[in-house]
Amino acid sequence: MRCVQCGHLEDKVIDSRMSKDGTTIRRRRVCLRCDYRYTTYEQIERTELRVVKRDNLREALNREKILRGLVKACEKRPVSMDRLDRAVEEIISELHRDHLREVPSSEIGKKVIEKLYAIDPVAYIRYVSVYRQFSNVEEFIQEITQMRHQTLIDPLQRKLPIL
């Protein structure tokens, strides 16, 4: 690797560490000419997923767009950015695992909904209300009722307050 200080092409790796999630390797290097130390990171390069929109247009999968949706849904909720970043990484990993080149936008929406359901019930309702284009209060009530029913069926789910 080319030294950023002197441009020499020979270096030596003096330390390698894997990230907590196992997707990145951090390497400390030293230039064999000038002894300058620097850090490099290795990541697996995934093929770019394309999102197929409702109107059949295609665009590159945008991590930031997914994160923005999560952040908006979790606004003023006790959810950390680290948790949202992890959720985005999980969503993207699942999409790469399940799809080779293209993924329908509806599939991304479903994954986001699943993650939000587990993270925060209020954020989930916010996101679902926009995603499914709720037009009246009855739709909110119906969704909350379904959530409550699901919680009763699955005791491992978070308990929601009774309205």
From Swiss-Prot:
GO terms for molecular function: ATP binding; DNA binding; zinc ion binding. Negatively regulates transcription of bacterial ribonucleotide reductase nrd genes and operons by binding to NrdR-boxes. It comes from Akkermansia muciniphila (strain ATCC BAA-835 / DSM 22959 / JCM 33894 / BCRC 81048 / CCUG 64013 / CIP 107961 / Muc). Coiled coil: none annotated. Binds 1 zinc ion. The keyword Zinc-finger applies. A zinc finger (unnamed) spans 3-34. Its cofactor is Zn(2+). GO terms for biological process: negative regulation of DNA-templated transcription. This is Transcriptional repressor NrdR. Belongs to the NrdR family. Residues 49-139 form the ATP-cone domain. Keywords: ATP-binding, DNA-binding, Metal-binding, Nucleotide-binding, Repressor, Transcription, Transcription regulation, Zinc, Zinc-finger. Pfam families: ATP-cone, Zn_ribbon_NrdR.
